Design a protein with these regions (language model features):
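Membrane-interface alpha helices of multi-pass inner-membrane proteins
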Residues: 127-128, 148-150, 160-178, 182-188, ...
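Short acidic/glycine- and proline-prone juxtamembrane loop motifs at membrane-interface regions
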Residues: 132-141
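Short hydrophobic alpha-helices at membrane interfaces in multi-pass membrane enzymes
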Residues: 150-171, 200-211, 289, 343-347
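Perimembrane helix-loop-helix junctions
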Residues: 168, 181-217, 283
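Membrane-lumen/periplasm interface segments of specific transmembrane helices
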Residues: 205-282
């Protein structure tokens, strides 16, 4: 406790978390609960009424209802029905959101406290589609982010391994296509069995992951099997779910490449500017700190632009896209801890980002959700670079980091853009910003 009182980074985190908590305590009281947010709540409600997943539901994202059922049960126990259910679920989301902020900060702070503070703030103001409710987007992003933090920090204790397993189970329940993430980690573990490059991928740790997975997987299997008529019927239902006509029926690669092409086309001016700055820093080593600072400012500028002019086009999901490219630049420039940065800080969230194209009918807008963990880890990469490559000037008798100042300005602009969008945007209410004038 004394360490928390003495450390200015700890105090900065607490102040930021308090501000974000107060902001959302105000914000969750406003905005309509239409379309997705209200629909999410029908699944756990029906489960409590006796329906079974994969038998009585048709959509790809239904498995999230299994995670929401305890919350709906608590709602019914405390209030006897569904009165106030939307507001109460938003409160559940806020509690979980703050918990993820705190846990991620505590884990990252042991690597870089300044980076941990900045990453926690970026995560705190990032909400997929502005949907402040426990759903397959919000819980999926939280799971991927914590997985990235745990692996990036090389956490391999029993508790960390069990938590990794639970998070993998949550991730797959939020998005079944995230079995690709699980398969990717198993592939890495298999390669590690021959090369021995990562201790946290050793067999004993992988076995503990599966104990964590079983915590959710076994109750889920019991729930599904007690409601199905036969195994063949269950398999047929699963097949029909993946052929859901409400979602794009084209091939997996077609959906992914279409979204990628659209992303590149919509941001071609940003990408051109980024390429010039990045290549300049790559070719001339001594100006890399300056170029990285300018890249961070460029990312923040485009986030501010999207917040001002495209708030109802991308639902605020694009604000963290630009930091994905900033993260890649910091990773390449840094050269230290490249394996952890690339594999867990960047590749893991990017793989999740691609799976969102397959599970959602929102295309690029859904894909952009996956850039939230990338952005948070990217901020951490920036901090790691500053620590390893300080670029300072004399100011008032003290050495001041020029790159640090540039990154601080970029962070302030990034947080300002995200705060503005979170305060103004209401999901699916493109023409009715007055929805924020009425309480829930």
């Amino acid at each position: 406790m004394r360490a928390w009182k003495k450390c200015r980074e700890h105090r900065a985190f607490l102040i930021g978390a308090l501000v974000i908590a107060c902001f959302y305590l105000w914000r969750i009281q406003y905005g309509n609960a239409e379309v997705d947010e209200a629909f999410y709540l029908t699944v756990p409600f029906r489960i409590l009424k006796g329906d079974r997943l994969l038998t009585d539901e048709w959509h790809v994202t239904q498995l999230t209802g299994f995670l929401q059922t305890p919350m709906m049960l608590l709602q019914r126990l405390l209030f006897g029905g569904t009165e106030g259910v939307v507001l109460h679920f938003r409160a559940f989301w806020l509690a979980g959101h703050l918990a993820v902020m705190t846990l991620s900060y505590a884990l990252l702070a042991q690597r870089n406290r300044v980076g941990a503070v900045a990453a926690s703030w970026v995560y705190g103001l990032s909400v997929p589609f502005g949907l402040m409710s426990p759903g397959y987007y919000t819980m999926g992003v939280a799971s991927v982010y914590l997985l990235a933090v745990l692996f990036y920090g090389r956490r391999d204790s029993r508790a960390a391994d069990l938590l990794k397993g639970v998070l993998l189970a949550v991730l797959v329940l939020c998005n079944p296509y995230c079995l690709a993430v699980y398969a990717g980690l198993l592939l890495l573990a298999g390669i590690n069995g021959f090369k021995h490059f990562d201790e946290q991928l050793e067999a004993v740790h992988v076995a503990r992951w599966h104990l964590g997975i079983a915590v959710l997987f076994l109750p889920f299997v019991f729930h599904v099997l007690t409601g199905t008529q036969s195994l063949s019927c269950l398999l047929e239902n699963i097949r029909n779910i993946f052929l859901d006509s409400a979602h794009d029926s084209s091939g997996f690669s077609d959906r992914i490449f279409y979204s990628l092409r659209m992303m590149l086309h919509e941001n071609r001016v940003f990408l051109l500017r980024f390429a010039v700055l990045f290549l300049a820093g790559l070719c001339i080593r001594r100006i890399r700190p300056l170029m990285l600072g300018m890249i961070a400012l460029l990312c923040a500028y485009d986030a501010l632009r999207d917040a001002r002019y495209f708030i109802y086009v991308w639902d605020g999901n694009s604000l963290t896209l630009f930091l994905l490219f900033g993260a890649a630049a910091a990773l390449i420039y840094c050269g230290q801890r490249a394996y952890e940065m690339l594999t867990y800080g960047l590749a893991l969230p990017v793989l999740y980002m691609l799976t969102l194209c397959l599970s959602s009918n929102q295309g690029l807008r859904a894909m952009l959700v996956g850039t939230i963990p990338c952005a948070c880890m990217g901020v951490m990469f920036f901090a790691e670079y500053v620590k390893a490559h300080p670029m300072s000037i004399a100011l008032g008798g003290r050495r001041v980091s020029c790159l640090g100042i540039m990154l601080a300005l970029a962070l302030a602009a990034q947080l300002g853009a995200q705060g503005y969008v979170r305060a103004k945007q209401v999901f699916w209410e493109y023409l009715e910003p007055q929805a924020l004038t009425a309480r829930m």
